[in-house]
């Protein structure tokens, strides 16, 4: 599933194709996953923003917003393909949403209403914004259960999925099964989250071996070339040379260097 770096890369690259453009209409698969799109036909896009893994489309002279979730394999393209699910007609051309596994969702809501949606209501702060405060994170981490599922819950901070949780934990030297982090651990993890996500956004996200994520211009992301743990099972840890191990935690494949990331607490 696209995580914060992939969604932010998508937002930045499609913004010039949509901002300032008037929506002339949509063509989309008959599906409950695309809701009330007709309500924004005729409106002009003012701004694309992001909340966690969601893209938010605002409009001029309207209180409506379009909420887009990419799902497992969703993405925008400049040209259609066999997996195109939504075609957006604008006054300057078309934009295409592709989604091979059909888990993406689009929904038009009243402005601000997205914050009350079940999947968005309990979201934590944005990791690359001013609302992600060290002291708040340290205090929450001191009470947290198993750290990786805690990160994936989106409550302490938004946008981390399997890839960037593994990478952040490796960089901070924290075992994914650790819990109730010390202040020193939490400070390292806080810094690692910001560093990993910043680098991943700058690299255009991660394109894995299945190739499901591509940037809107058709190029892959490149951060997978910098992965230190994720997807490196049995390969040497770039830090110490010990083999990266993979195990399952909370139903998620988890990658760890047990030398660099010793389990400190039962």
Region locations from a protein language model:
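Gly/Gly-Pro- and Ser/Thr-rich, intrinsically disordered tail segments characteristic of DNA damage-repair
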Residues: 1-108, 114, 264-266
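Alpha-helical structural motif
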Residues: 3-6, 10, 19, 80, ...
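Basic, nucleic-acid-binding surfaces and adjacent catalytic neighborhoods in DNA/RNA-processing proteins
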Residues: 22-37, 43, 49, 54-56, ...
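Phosphate/anion-contacting hairpin/loop surfaces
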Residues: 59-174, 183
């Amino acid at each position: 599933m696209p995580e914060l770096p992939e969604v932010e890369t998508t937002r930045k690259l499609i913004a010039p194709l949509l901002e300032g453009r008037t929506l002339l209409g949509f063509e989309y698969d008959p599906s409950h996953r695309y809701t009330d799109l007709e309500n924004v036909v005729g409106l002009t896009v003012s701004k694309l923003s992001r909340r966690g893994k969601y893209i938010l489309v605002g409009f001029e002279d309207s209180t409506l917003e379009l909420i887009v979730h990419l799902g497992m394999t969703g993405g925008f393209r400049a040209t259609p393909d066999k997996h195109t699910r939504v075609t957006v007609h604008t006054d300057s051309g078309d934009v295409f949403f592709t989604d091979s596994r059909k888990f993406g969702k689009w929904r038009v809501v009243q402005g601000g209403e997205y914050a009350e949606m079940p999947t968005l209501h309990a979201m934590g702060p944005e990791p690359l914004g001013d609302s992600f405060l060290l002291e708040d994170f340290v205090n929450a981490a001191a009470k947290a259960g198993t750290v990786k599922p805690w990160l994936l819950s989106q409550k302490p901070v938004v946008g981390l999925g399997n890839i960037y949780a593994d990478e952040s934990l490796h960089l901070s030297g924290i075992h994914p099964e650790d819990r109730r982090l010390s202040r020193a651990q939490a400070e390292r993890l806080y810094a690692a989250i910001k560093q990993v996500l910043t680098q991943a956004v700058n690299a255009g996200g991660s394109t894995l071996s299945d190739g499901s994520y591509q940037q809107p211009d058709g190029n892959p992301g490149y951060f997978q070339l910098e992965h230190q743990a994720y997807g490196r099972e049995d390969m040497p840890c770039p830090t110490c040379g010990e083999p990266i191990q993979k195990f399952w935690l909370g139903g998620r494949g988890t990658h760890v260097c047990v030398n660099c990331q010793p389990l400190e607490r039962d």
